[in-house]
Amino acid sequence: MSMTLGYWDIRGLAHAIRLLLEYTDSSYEEKKYTMGDAPDYDRSQWLNEKFKLGLDFPNLPYLIDGAHKITQSNAILCYIARKHNLCGETEEEKIRVDILENQAMDVSNQLARVCYSPDFEKLKPEYLEELPTMMQHFSQFLGKRPWFVGDKITFVDFLAYDVLDLHRIFEPNCLDAFPNLKDFISRFEGLEKISAYMKSSRFLPKPLYTRVAVWGNK
């Protein structure tokens, strides 16, 4: 029986989840909800179903896999990853997974706050000033490893890819000083399942955010 992934018809928080579902060759279908245009940004497609799905904390994205009904994007990633042993094996690897899972979410949220803010034009230059340091931390954490945790890919590589790619779209030159991050992105995009997905009609690279956002809403 196929899993169902529910989310807005955007990239957003579902990008890493979709990539992981494809990489693991999981059987799934998507339930995509459309938000209305300004000024109302009608969300009735989702709100009409929100409390009817049996979710403990009704929100998007959600994943329904038989009796398992999961919200929170990282919880969904962890659930899929545990099925395929993509959570790290040693204690050291699991520590690195935990650190990067939270760091990637922090940085992703920081960018989203800027992109959704009415003060976007004021906040963007300030964010760009901090960007090299953010990327340097990712670069140092990766080091000479092929994947962020070590020799084997884990689910946090999908989060890291998402956040690095988002920033590459936001500021195309932001990775130029960090060849190991550029190599990581190429390595990730070169994975057979990922490459095939990115060439398919299912792939949804944009819009990055919902229509409420000031930047990345198209």
Curated annotation (Swiss-Prot):
GO terms for cellular component: cytoplasm; cytosol; intercellular bridge. Its EC number is 2.5.1.18, 4.4.1.20. Glutathione binds at Y7, W8, W46, L47, N48, E49, K50, N59, L60, Q72, S73. Residues 90-208 form the GST C-terminal domain. Keywords: Cytoplasm, Lipid metabolism, Lyase, Transferase. It catalyses: RX + glutathione = an S-substituted glutathione + a halide anion + H(+); 1-chloro-2,4-dinitrobenzene + glutathione = 2,4-dinitrophenyl-S-glutathione + chloride + H(+); (13S,14S)-epoxy-(4Z,7Z,9E,11E,16Z,19Z)-docosahexaenoate + glutathione = (13R)-S-glutathionyl-(14S)-hydroxy-(4Z,7Z,9E,11E,16Z,19Z)-docosahexaenoate; leukotriene C4 = leukotriene A4 + glutathione. It holds the Pfam family GST_N. GO terms for biological process: glutathione metabolic process; long-chain fatty acid biosynthetic process; nitrobenzene metabolic process; xenobiotic catabolic process. One of its GO terms (molecular function) is leukotriene-C4 synthase activity. Expressed in a wide variety of tissues. InterPro entries: Glutathione-S-Trfase_C-like, Glutathione-S-Trfase_C_sf, Glutathione_S-Trfase, Glutathione_S-Trfase_N, GST_C, GST_mu, GST_superfamily, Thioredoxin-like_sf. Substrate binds at Y116. Residues 2-88 form the GST N-terminal domain. Its main location: cytoplasm. It is found in: Cytoplasm. Belongs to the GST superfamily. Mu family. Homodimer. Conjugation of reduced glutathione to a wide number of exogenous and endogenous hydrophobic electrophiles. Catalyzes the conjugation of leukotriene A4 with reduced glutathione (GSH) to form leukotriene C4. Can also catalyze the transfer of a glutathionyl group from glutathione (GSH) to 13(S),14(S)-epoxy-docosahexaenoic acid to form maresin conjugate in tissue regeneration 1 (MCTR1), a bioactive lipid mediator that possess potent anti-inflammatory and proresolving actions. This is Glutathione S-transferase Mu 4. The lineage of its organism: Eukaryota, Metazoa, Chordata, Craniata, Vertebrata. The gene is GSTM4.
